[in-house]
Amino acid sequence: MSIILAKKSGFCYGVKRAVDTCLKIKQNYPDKIIYTLGPLIHNNDVVDFLKTKNIFSIGYENIDTLKEGDIIILRSHGVTLETIQKLKEKKLNIIDATCPYVSNIQKKAQKYYKEGYSILIVGDKNHPEVIGINGWCNNSAIICRKAEEIEDLPKKICVVSQTTEKKEHWISVLSKVVNECREVVAFNTICNATEVRQLSAEDLSKEVDFMIVIGSKSSSNTTKLYEICKNNCSNTIHIENAGELPDYISNKYSKIGVTAGASTPDWIIKEAIFKMSNKNLNEQLEYMENNDIQISIGQEVEGEIVSIVSSNEAYVNIGYKSDAILLLSEVTKDNDEDINNFVKKGDIIKGKIIKLGSENKPPVISVIELNRENAYVELKEAFENKEKVVVKVKEDVNGGLISIYKNIVRVFIPASHVELRHVDDLSIYKGCELTVNIIEFEEGRNNTRIVASRRDLLKEEQSKVEEETWSSLEKDTIKEGEVRRLTDFGAFVNINGVDGLLHVSEISWGRVEKPSDMLKVGDKIKVYIKDIDKDKKKLALSIKDLTKDPWKDVEVKYPVGNIVLGTVVRFASFGAFVELEPGVDGLIHISQISHKRVDRVEDELSIGEQVKAKIVEVDGEKRKIGLSIKEVNDI
């Protein structure tokens, strides 16, 4: 005969935590009677064991018999919010041993009820866990175990599950809800330990001749284990302890399977196996001992994400007697992040144990600590080999940017190394990913100083672009550029990373006093490459050469003897210059303004004034046109 114990069976984390909490409280108060509000867990043997320690279960109806200062422990299944308020009013010493998974469901029910959602609980309406959850949404929840039990559904609904419910029930109910409701928020709150235990029992029950399910007859999860096993193995029995084992089993069956509910302690399982095998120890007991792994600080472990209880924490099944907790701070250094952005339920992760578990708290696992050493090695290699790395900016500080590498290692970027030019507001980089070079890696006794530069990479990129641009530029071609800088003598125009000078005299055929009168920084303009010296990296540009020289054929356009209309644009001591068209000015000599004596030009004319004048001279080669106002007046 062989006895096979299911790989996952017996106490779950929440149950063990509740029992351990009771025993620890008793150690702290050895002379006091301790009370639990209802049976601490669904296991009569454990409840009887607690009685021997002066830890007694009382019903809700007996709360009024308690006195101020009495110790009352909330059962692992949780209680209603109203019950907690009543206990507080009596000024009792309340110890909360509610399973963390159940507490999570209670908080969700309360939150979404306050936001206007109807709450639907997939589970047994008479189970204390479900009764407790319902109490966190004003006892208004819709409670069912199967889809066919639901009739009229509200349009806005939040769905949760009893932690020990069958997955098939959850799926059937959720399918109906999704099809009939307009707005659905659903949380699969079936405890992973329950699901794993059920799968393990199902697999084992298909392989054996006889199946034994150990646990309280009042335990919901144990009853479900029995139903699952019975479906696969007709020779399945449900017992509470070894005393209920039939005598014929050992002689009649050669392959016996054993599983146990979440409220069944190891000693009850061992007692049952011992009775069947008639040995002090056998392979299955050894398996139980070996399966109860030991952990130590710094130990590398691998596990599965079994639940994400908030934006800051998740639980990981590492094969230990309780799940480990993974905090956001142990995944990333960015406190503004959400742990859901890094892990999902079902993910397999690796980490290091950084805190051992206690009676009331699970062990803590860190992804950061496992990856930190590798991250430092990578950054050191990047520094030595001058390789690029990508960092994410966390915040701007006086003097630069604080960034993180792989959500673990702090890297500082000085303000002068962020861009090629000075940046006034560094806050615009918060949350951005930047590619940088490590320019300083200094290992100290207590920390490592790491400094990076983005400017150096930008310089390299700029140099590459400049070289490509210089290779492509040719004299007497037209390019598009951007005005980057203005001076009194011209404008600097950038063409694909190369700056060229647009002299003030090349902006227009007309007279330009200041470049800023015609252009502004940021303007996109077309320019003519007037001259280029690739060796000296000099580029002369022109806008006016994009248009025809207005002095060409000027004798034809402005024949001598004709009257022309122009605009006075500037004065000289010897006369006034009149613009005939952009780039073509004529001179009215002071002697040609009037028949009377003119001492000052500005006494007779004003800037911007339009005047008629006779063309008296045209010299295209010397770019001169002589005009006369007084000869117009003679006509």
Swiss-Prot record:
PROSITE patterns: S1 (PS50126). Binds 1 [4Fe-4S] cluster per subunit. The active site is at E129. Residues 1-279 are annotated as: 4-hydroxy-3-methylbut-2-enyl diphosphate reductase. In the N-terminal section; belongs to the IspH family. (2E)-4-hydroxy-3-methylbut-2-enyl diphosphate binds at H42, H77, H127, T163, S219, S220, N221, S263. [4Fe-4S] cluster binds at C12, C99, C191. One of its GO terms (molecular function) is nucleic acid binding. The lineage of its organism: Bacteria, Bacillati, Bacillota, Clostridia, Eubacteriales. GO terms for biological process: dimethylallyl diphosphate biosynthetic process; isopentenyl diphosphate biosynthetic process, methylerythritol 4-phosphate pathway; terpenoid biosynthetic process. It catalyses: isopentenyl diphosphate + 2 oxidized [2Fe-2S]-[ferredoxin] + H2O = (2E)-4-hydroxy-3-methylbut-2-enyl diphosphate + 2 reduced [2Fe-2S]-[ferredoxin] + 2 H(+); dimethylallyl diphosphate + 2 oxidized [2Fe-2S]-[ferredoxin] + H2O = (2E)-4-hydroxy-3-methylbut-2-enyl diphosphate + 2 reduced [2Fe-2S]-[ferredoxin] + 2 H(+). NCBIfam families: ispH_lytB, PRK00087.1, PRK01045.1-1. It is an enzyme of class 1 (oxidoreductase). Residues 298-373, 380-455, 476-544, 561-630 form the S1 motif domain. Pfam families: LYTB, S1. This is 4-hydroxy-3-methylbut-2-enyl diphosphate reductase. PANTHER family: 4-HYDROXY-3-METHYLBUT-2-ENYL DIPHOSPHATE REDUCTASE (PTHR30426:SF0). Its cofactor is [4Fe-4S] cluster. Keywords: 4Fe-4S, Iron, Iron-sulfur, Isoprene biosynthesis, Metal-binding, Oxidoreductase. Dimethylallyl diphosphate binds at H42, H77, H127, S219, S220, N221, S263. Pathway: Isoprenoid biosynthesis; dimethylallyl diphosphate biosynthesis; dimethylallyl diphosphate from (2E)-4-hydroxy-3-methylbutenyl diphosphate: step 1/1; Isoprenoid biosynthesis; isopentenyl diphosphate biosynthesis via DXP pathway; isopentenyl diphosphate from 1-deoxy-D-xylulose 5-phosphate: step 6/6.
